[in-house]
Amino acid sequence: MGLDQIQTKTNLCSKAVSTLSGLSSLWKLLLVGALGLGSAMTQTAAAVDADFTIGNKLADMLRASRSVVSANQGLINDPDIGDKQFSSEKFVQAADAIYLKRVGTTLNLSELSERDRRLLDAQRRAMRLVVDDHQAEINRIGVGFKGFIPAIFARLTNEEFGAIAAQEARIRVTAPPDLVRNRKARPDPWEKNILETRFLTSGWPKGKAFTEEVEFEGRLAFRMLLPEYYRESCLACHGTPKGELDITSYPKEGGIVGDLAGAISIVIFR
């Protein structure tokens, strides 16, 4: 073999090594990129899971606190009792008891993340503020119906929560347009779409929440809508006969147990 042939083969080998080295670098870049993408996806999934968990806790506590108001309507509306001992502290204790009974665990704030503690603490503060603000009305002698019903309590509590935690989260109760009594509860386009295309369809699993990451007020947010259905205790105001005036002088909706009554809407900003 001549020197020229040897040199040619040497050059070819060098090019092959260089090519392999380039491919190796490319694969390294692809691998790093894949690992980075996988890490980002894992972090996103973890964030969604965390938001879903705190969303459920907030919704469950709202439901528990509404149940306390519902269960105490007889006491609240008793015109013969002055100081009803319906303090905000006792109220929160009763809500915690119902939460435990329904969920199976207590709300141990010390075991939660800093953000989740802030949100749940904000909700509890809001509950206390609303009950404290209505003490004079609740304890008014000579007046029967006070108007302090579950729906009013929930709306006021959610508004107080929004004032406290506005930069981190929002909660409100909404419903299909034909069931909305208060204009403030009208569904926004996103909520209306989910109510009509998911919750009101026969194929949607009863009780299943809908979640989505979307833009809300110019910020990326985790949105969660949890369906609510009429219970027996709801029918005094929302049952039959449809059109009959309830205790608030509003026409009943004609609902029956199990019908979709509305939804709890939760926004958690990223």
Where on the chain are the PLM-derived regions?
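Bacterial N-terminal signal peptides
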Residues: 28-40
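The canonical Cys-X-X-Cys-His
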Residues: 230-242
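Intrinsic structural disorder/low-complexity segments
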Residues: 8-10, 46, 241
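Extended, compositionally biased low-complexity polar/Lys-Gly-rich tracts
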Residues: 26-27, 150
